[in-house]
Amino acid sequence: MQRRGALFSVPGGGGKMAAGDLGELLVPHMPTIRVPRSGDRVYKNECAFSYDSPNSEGGLYVCMNTFLAFGREHVERHFRKTGQSVYMHLKRHMREKVRGASGGALPKRRNSKIFLDLDMDDDLNSDDYEYEDEAKLVIFPDHYEIALPNIEELPALVTIACDAVLSSKSPYRKQDPDTWENEVPVSKYANNLVQLDNGVRIPPSGWKCARCDLRENLWLNLTDGSVLCGKWFFDSSGGNGHALEHYRDMGYPLAVKLGTITPDGADVYSFQEEGPVSDPHLAKHLAHFGIDMLHTQGTENGLRDNDIKPRVSEWEVIQESGTKLKPMYGPGYTGLKNLGNSCYLSSVMQAIFSIPEFQRAYVGNLPRIFDYSPLDPTQDFNTQMTKLGHGLLSGQYSKPPVKSELIEQVMKEEHKPQQNGISPRMFKAFVSKSHPEFSSNRQQDAQEFFLHLVNLVERNRIGSENPSDVFRFLVEERIQCCQTRKVRYTERVDYLMQLPVAMEAATNKDELITYELMRREAEANRRPLPELVRAKIPFSACLQAFAEPDNVDDFWSSALQAKSAGVKTSRFASFPEYLVVQIKKFTFGLDWVPRKFDVSIDMPDLLDISHLRARGLQPGEEELPDISPPIVIPDDSKDRLMNQLIDPSDIDESSVMQLAEMGFPLEACRKAVYFTGNTGAEVAFNWIIVHMEEPDFAEPLAIPGYGGAGASVFGATGLDNQPPEEIVAIITSMGFQRNQAVQALQATNHNLERALDWIFSHPEFEEDSDFVIEMENNANANIVSEAKPEGPRVKDGSGMYELFAFISHMGTSTMSGHYVCHIKKEGRWVIYNDHKVCASERPPKDLGYMYFYRRIPS
């Protein structure tokens, strides 16, 4: 029976088609239409490949099977790749509110149930506009359109699916860490916790487990002040379980993890309750051991009242307040909206995408990266980097208002707001999802995020192209045994130069002393504070402090076969193409209060560090014997190593990340963690020291019997690792060669999505295709690659640099405050302050935190 009343559009703008044909159109696609489950992420605010939204001119298309969203330019790509034909098209129409009798009324919302969770444009005054939301189903490839809501005419399953999509919450709210942080229970021991009056005071640094030498994953027992290491399986970090043993011996229930204490709280664990807990009296319990966690929490932003006025000038100078700054528009002048303490990410990404190598690697390869992206591009690093880079560089989201367009819009009574600035919400959600700090809404250290990003770029490099190579350099470390005078030269990889602040070299010491006396007097008499006097530090003094020898704690002398005093000096074994300099402004006082050196350093526009070039072993120097220190593995770790061979897929990635951030090759870090049985980064580090001279040190982990991602495909026997034919068929149906599909699946443990990533990241495959076919056909082949291990990739050159960008921080610590970025483009400085991009009039180069230099060609 023909349904009555419903009509839908026919492509080409022709007539209408009767509703009775709705069922016939949807029947072939019914198996692909899903109702979102509780764990599904439904994207209806933002395209997976661009920053298009329902506010965009073309609206947004939500796939009714994957619930991914696509702008008009990208929906066809998803249709071709997946064959999914049914999409929900979402469009928001905005009009300026008619003034008069209705003036001052609340904005008019039509179809109010459609976009309950749609983000509003913060730049628009909602009192001035009304909007109408439109939703319809679109069937590809013929673009049949069915208006929604259409309860009477659509099949029940389709109606339920549409309602579920329209009422779903944002996927970012689902993964907001505050959701689970608030669910941590209050410990039943917190109110009446017994604390021993034993005189223990905990220093702000230099901690070590009281029962072993571990210096990471340390926990402070809140009863007796013991500092002991945690268990490796608690939070995926290394430890020998001495904190748990102490609880079993003494029964003291609560411990706090050192290194997580902030004015907002800390990680507290209850051994008795066997899980994370909250302690409402944590400040008092920490104060018992000399830790004043609330010392910086006098105001909402975490600053003491006395800290506010002295810092006002810093905020004004860095943001160039009081100066009328000219807004900048167009390619390369797009801002990033602040998601709430996300300015550290925005500043780093603006600097990163001002570098041509990153522009070419991602935006330059956009069609290829997007075409070969995995089925869920929101969970792919390269796709999201490309999306962000295109958003920043295309100019598509940074357009100046044009008078003629404004007049035309007024005549049509429809407002088409220009989108200035993009929201990095999808990018931040992905790059921070495995990091406990970056995934929070708290302020973070821009330097730490920079290293985290470099690590992700390294792990997800596109074939042989790795844009982070421009930052990589080799550091030569010379360690001298003070007792025998013998030396050892080693090299390590680094990505930035950390420059100490030479406070003792201040050129205005008399002014500083006078200011400090006046400040204390004003505080004592509750008078206004004097105008801030900032220490002026010569850059040359900081450079000299970097070159000075450092004492080495716990140095093991191979000449003495025992621990001894040692001194270390560092030099550049190679100079990077781009030099990142971090000014070490942040520290902790003895009272545990985070402090920032409020200094002015005369950073040069032209930098010459050629004199810091490493020279290697000098005549007359005698090398320390090449003897490694003994590896000490705890007894419980030995038992676990003897009795259990872990699966390569279970490798503790957090320990791998810790080691990789020290500069060791990623595959070497994976092997170190694997062969030490997931016993923590400390033990794995010792393994690296022992094995780093071996020829296969940096080669991928290859375990007989496993075909994981780390295993070399050339080390497998032909039929031992044959992938299922149905998965091979899926890949070949996408246009890839069969032998290409087989090799990709063998290299990724038969994981379909990872295999597609592998194919895209190995463009050199075709050159070796004949060899792969021969290997596949020969079931008894056992060919092992004899390629030499690849050393660190560095781009050495001269030590002459010019400044092109710097990131500045305002506030007293990395846990609070604000970041902005200045970049020199087209001969002039530009300030990037979240979504605001303006020409800089007075760039505060002396107050920066991170500086980006590019090498001057010799």
Swiss-Prot record:
Specifically inhibited by spautin-1 (specific and potent autophagy inhibitor-1), a derivative of MBCQ that binds to USP13 and inhibits deubiquitinase activity. Regulated by PIK3C3/VPS34-containing complexes. The weak deubiquitinase activity in vitro suggests the existence of some mechanism that activates the enzyme. Keywords: Autophagy, Cytoplasm, Hydrolase, Isopeptide bond, Metal-binding, Phosphoprotein, Protease, Repeat, Thiol protease, Ubl conjugation, Ubl conjugation pathway, Zinc, Zinc-finger. InterPro entries: Papain-like_cys_pep_sf (IPR038765), Peptidase_C19_UCH (IPR001394), Ub_carboxyl-term_hydrolase (IPR050185), UBA (IPR015940), UBA-like_sf (IPR009060), Ubiquitinyl_hydrolase (IPR016652), UBP13_Znf-UBP_var (IPR041432), USP_CS (IPR018200). It catalyses: Thiol-dependent hydrolysis of ester, thioester, amide, peptide and isopeptide bonds formed by the C-terminal Gly of ubiquitin (a 76-residue protein attached to proteins as an intracellular targeting signal). There is a cross-link at residues 309, 403 (Glycyl lysine isopeptide (Lys-Gly) (interchain with G-Cter in SUMO2)). One of its GO terms (biological process) is proteolysis. A zinc finger (UBP-type) spans 185-293. It comes from the Eukaryota. The modification Phosphoserine is found at residue 112. Residues 334-856 form the USP domain. Zn(2+) binds at residues 209, 212, 229, 242. The active site is at residues 343, 818. It holds the Pfam family UBA_7. It is found in: Cytoplasm. Its EC number is 3.4.19.12. GO terms for cellular component: cytoplasm. GO terms for molecular function: BAT3 complex binding; cysteine-type deubiquitinase activity; cysteine-type endopeptidase activity; K48-linked deubiquitinase activity; proteasome binding; protein-folding chaperone binding; ubiquitin binding; ubiquitin protein ligase binding. Residues 650-691, 722-762 form the UBA domain. Deubiquitinase that mediates deubiquitination of target proteins such as BECN1, MITF, SKP2 and USP10 and is involved in various processes such as autophagy, endoplasmic reticulum-associated degradation (ERAD), cell cycle progression or DNA damage response. Component of a regulatory loop that controls autophagy and p53/TP53 levels: mediates deubiquitination of BECN1, a key regulator of autophagy, leading to stabilize the PIK3C3/VPS34-containing complexes. Alternatively, forms with NEDD4 a deubiquitination complex, which subsequently stabilizes VPS34 to promote autophagy. Belongs to the peptidase C19 family. Interacts with UFD1. Interacts (via UBA domains) with SIAH2 (when ubiquitinated). Interacts with BAG6; the interaction is direct and may mediate UBL4A deubiquitination. Interacts (via UBA 2 domain) with AMFR; the interaction is direct. Interacts with UBL4A; may be indirect via BAG6. Interacts with NEDD4. The UBP-type zinc finger has lost its ability to bind ubiquitin and USP13 is not activated by unanchored ubiquitin. This is Ubiquitin carboxyl-terminal hydrolase 13. It comes from Mus musculus (Mouse).
